[in-house]
Design a protein with these regions (language model features):
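C-terminal beta-signal and adjacent terminal beta-strands/loops
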Residues: 608, 682-687, 708-760
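Structural signature of Gram-negative outer-membrane beta-barrels, strongest in the C-terminal barrel
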Residues: 218, 358, 362-366, 371, ...
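Outer-membrane beta-barrel proteins
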Residues: 164-171, 194-220, 224, 236-239, ...
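Face-selective signature of the C-terminal outer-membrane beta-barrel domain
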Residues: 300-326, 339-473, 500
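Acidic, small-polar-rich N-terminal luminal/periplasmic segments of exported/outer-membrane proteins
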Residues: 13-156, 547
Length: 760
């Protein structure tokens, strides 16, 4: 079956999911063999999913340095701001997962994790839709990105140093060098990156160091071992954007002034506070909800090992191992606390690839000790135009009594509920505090069956057994700490039909069913108000039906594809519950790479609705925060906010997502040593809040760059201008819509960046 390969090819060992053929290294999607979460010997045309591979060079050419910027080169990746530092991708309107070398990372709790450094990235492959049976159950099923770590070159040493400077005192440096220890047998690669960045936004910035080291060994023919270590130390700002997102703020930059007053008369931000508007002013877009005394930092250590050996003709064994340790501490002046006092994840997956069949076993262990407190936050009552004290929420004695003191003066929620006074009602505020451990064991099988010369059926099945224990790590004095154990079995199955009418075109239809988990910070599990692990957290059903077409002519600089999909999945709410979401849509992409030019174009249409499920928001609408004393400014309802609105089950449109978006990126070499490039993203209008009282209009962002290479191509200077037309764009602060009525994020104004790169 030359037209439809089904055998794992073993002459080349690659630890990647999808490879963009290196016409210039920038990624015209081609038909190279691949290994990864969908099996060995695959090409992008062989995989029945919508996929965008992004090579390291393409990341550099499109100036992509965080997950949100992936939308410049990939359709259906529109993303909320993730409080200024998204730690998870968004695919098809839902948070996705981050995999590295085919193994799922801890990352964040609903996106509020730690920034993702691109220092270790050799390639990022963007896969839309549920994970394969090889990958197994995950919390987030809109899709995933798989990072292929950098690897040493075994033929010749090479290195690169880059220095970057931009507006607002943003500086960065990276040293990347690959040594050949034994030609064509073993090598080492080291990449060190440091960032010291100020910010356009008030009281914001980032200071990080990332060290990545990789070792590659080919001890014998048809045998390879890749191991890598990454250490990341980062301090950054939890940036909540601007509160009180009225339509006047979005359209004209006008902000309603006045500090909220609680029912007890306090002007400290709190539940059901009401603002009597005192004026409406043009607010600087840099005036965001931050505080100079906030503390926010993290350290993480990752270890990856991939061993790949050919046992016999068309029989290959692959063993992947992964370990991650995370520590994190955020203490904010608005009373928010999240401390990960140690999270450890260890996973091993063994795959046996026999002709057209893949068999495997997976074992994953996760242990998390963490403390949190988010029950007293209140964004809408705060007047950002007033003194910093407006933003501070010192806890009252009554509030402290419903929490537990972790350190002198620092209060967090206990990890369970207790009735101290015996009145039959719990006496504490619960967040995500937990001391939990979990063991996950999985078995999977995937088989490819040729039906005719041009028709192939791929079937896969998987089962995962979970055993989870959650304990209260900081129970109040005088009570026995609560704990619970839960075991469950999760199932997954998928089927893909491929039809290849000729060498250039592939048609596919995929159907998938999977059950996934719902976790708290760092992948932990919490006790509910009844001091038990909620079994519904292990019963989240996800379905995917997708049909697509891929055009990949051999020897051509062109690649194009299109996909139609219908997908159901869940949305984890702030209180730990889950809401169903149904999505359907269309996405298409086109790539071209010629001798002097490259182009990437993407488009998507998305219809996302609640799947007869409840929804939650900080307030029913922004007007709830105001009284009606100044109808000339805003017609307030006087309800007070936050009021923790709960909306009944419905099929309401999922807010915070555009119906459609378009993206384009490209570059052109117009003279010897000189090149220009740019990118553009256009999004439709969309409602910011559940009741659709505030609308983000159609927006576009245009970026441009000019580069000059000299010294026989070894030296390069590049100037980037971002937001070239200086648009005043807005983005949701967080995924899922909870903050839709209370916060919105102002995107950066026009700014420039200069980069010098020296290769040696």
């Amino acid at each position: 079956m030359a037209a439809l390969p089904v055998h794992a090819q073993t002459g080349s060992i690659q630890d990647v999911l999808v490879v963009g053929e290196a016409l210039s290294g920038m990624g015209n999607v081609r038909s190279d063999e691949v290994d990864g979460p969908f099996g060995l010997g695959q090409t992008i045309a062989d995989i029945g999913r919508s996929i965008t591979p992004v090579t390291e060079d393409l990341l550099n050419e499109a100036a992509i340095d965080n997950l949100q910027e992936l939308q410049r080169v990939a359709p259906n990746t529109f993303q909320a701001k993730g409080f200024g530092a998204p730690s998870l991708p968004t695919l098809r309107g839902q948070l996705g997962e981050v995999f590295s070398a085919g193994m799922r990372r801890q990352v964040g709790n609903n996106g509020l994790g730690i920034p993702l450094s691109f220092n270790s990235v050799g390639q990022i492959d963007i896969v839309r839709g549920t994970p394969s049976v090889i990958l197994g159950t995950t919390q987030r099923t809109g899709g995933f990105v798989n990072i292929t770590p950098k690897r040493p070159d075994l033929n010749e040493p090479e290195g690169r140093v880059s220095l970057t400077g931009g507006e607002w005192d943003q500086y960065g440096a990276q040293l990347d060098y690959s040594w050949v220890i034994d030609p064509e047998r073993q090598g080492v690669r080291l990449s060190l990156e440091h960032k010291d960045e100020g910010s356009f936004y008030d009281y914001a910035g980032l200071d990080s160091t990332n060290l990545f080291a990789a070792y590659r060994l080919l001890p014998a023919e048809h045998m390879e071992w890749n191991v890598s270590l990454e250490y990341y130390d980062v301090e950054w700002t939890d940036n909540a954007g601007i509160n009180r997102p009225t339509q006047n703020l979005i359209d004209h930059g006008l902000y309603v002034q006045g500090q909220g007053v609680q029912p007890n008369g306090s002007t400290v931000p709190g539940a059901f506070a009401v603002v009597s508007p005192t004026g409406e002013v043009k607010i600087p877009r840099s005036r965001v909800h931050t505080h100079p005394d906030d503390i926010n930092g993290a350290e993480t250590l990752l270890l990856h090992s991939v061993f790949n050996v050919e046992l016999a003709d068309s029989i290959r064994l692959v063993n992947r191992s992964y370990y991650e340790h995370l520590e994190r501490e955020e203490i904010a002046q608005n009373s928010f606390v999240e401390i990960v006092d140690g999270a450890d994840t260890l996973e091993n997956r063994t795959e046996l690839h026999i002709h057209n069949t893949t068999l495997g076993a997976n074992l994953r262990y996760n242990d998390v000790l963490g403390y949190s407190q988010f029950t007293t936050e209140a964004d809408l009552p705060t007047d950002l135009t007033g003194p910093l004290s407006n933003r501070e929420i010192p806890l009252t004695d009554a509030q402290k009594a419903r929490l537990v003191e972790l350190r002198p003066g620092l209060f967090v929620s206990p990890g369970a509920q207790y009735d101290i006074d015996g009145d039959g009602v719990g006496d504490f505020n619960l967040s995500d505090t937990t001391d939990s451990s979990s063991v996950q064991g999985g078995l999977f099988v995937q088989h490819k069956q040729p039906l005719t010369e041009r028709l192939q059926l791929t079937l896969g099945a998987r089962g995962d057994w979970y055993d989870v224990t959650a304990r209260d790590p900081i129970a109040p004095e005088g009570v026995e700490a609560a704990r619970d154990n839960h075991s469950d079995f999760l199932k997954a199955g998928e089927a893909t039909l491929h039809y290849r009418p000729n060498e250039s075109v592939t048609l596919y239809a995929t159907s998938s069913y999977s059950e996934s988990t719902s976790n708290s910070m760092a992948g932990g599990n919490v006790l509910g108000a009844n001091n038990q692990i909620d079994p519904l957290n292990f019963a989240t059903e996800n379905t995917l039906h997708e049909i697509g077409l891929k055009y990949a002519p051999a020897g051509s600089p062109w690649y194009a594809d299109a996909a139609l999909f219908d997908q159901t999945r869940s949305l984890r709410n702030r209180d730990g519950s889950n809401s169903g979401v149904a999505t359907r849509g269309l996405e298409t992409q086109l790539f071209y790479r010629g001798e002097a030019a490259w182009v990437s174009v993407g488009a998507n249409w998305l219809d996302a609705e609640f799947d007869n499920s409840a929804a939650f928001q900080a307030a029913e609408q922004v007007a709830d925060a105001f009284d009606d004393s100044r109808p000339d400014i805003i017609q307030g309802t006087g309800v007070g906010a936050p009021n923790f609105a709960a909306f009944p089950a419905s099929s309401q449109r999922l807010h915070g997502l555009p119906d459609w978006s378009l993206s384009a990126a490209g570059g052109y070499v117009f003279a010897e040593g000189w090149s220009v490039g740019g990118s553009a993203v256009l999004t439709s209008d969309y409602p910011l809040d559940y009741l659709q009282t505030v609308t983000i209009p159609e927006q576009f962002t245009l970026n441009a760059n000019l580069a000059y290479e000299f010294n026989q191509g070894a030296s390069r200077i590049r100037l980037d201008v971002f937001n070239l037309t200086d648009e005043e764009n807005w983005t949701p602060v967080f995924e899922g819509g909870y903050f839709g009525s209370s916060l919105v994020f102002p995107e950066l104004p026009r700014h420039v960046q200069l980069q010098f790169t020296q290769r040696f």
